[in-house]
């Protein structure tokens, strides 16, 4: 949600919680003046401290969502730079690959690491993504707090949406 706020240059567009995984439903954000173009905030159930039963429900829901939405143009996968490529992250990338959608990984909270550590993580993630997903997935460092990478992300999304 904080990435959406940074992307759209609005501090309170998407509700942000200190606890990861609080988004528990699909939240659609229109992109005026572009009719029928939306950003969608998905449940971060891989990070939420919720019962296994609820996680299973979200997973089934997202399976259906990704399987039935022909209008999807790309998927931004939000990963904590300190803990990248968790099972949930791989699952989200799998959704994109099965649908033939481009995916773009943002390694968030990059301001929490030094430049060297952030760069090392970026390189390691880039290598693993190239090994497992070829050229279908791009990756960058990102910080909603310091605005690092916001312009790059905006450019990727604009390209997908033809803006």
Task: Place the predicted regions along the sequence by residue.
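Conserved catalytic network of the ASCE P-loop NTPase/AAA+ motor domain
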Residues: 20-23, 30-35, 66-72, 95-99, ...
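Active-site glycine-centered loops adjacent to acidic/histidine catalytic or metal-binding residues
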Residues: 41, 108, 143
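Hydrophobic anchor at the start of a short beta-strand
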Residues: 37, 103, 137-139
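Helical mechanochemical/support elements of P-loop NTPase systems and associated helical scaffolds
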Residues: 12, 25, 54-58, 71, ...
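Canonical P-loop GTPase G-domain recognition
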Residues: 112-163
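Inter-motif core of Ras-like GTPase G domains
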Residues: 54-83, 94-106
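Flexible beta-alpha connector loops of hexameric P-loop NTPases
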Residues: 45-55, 111-114
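Conserved G1/Walker A P-loop phosphate-binding module
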Residues: 1-49, 162-163
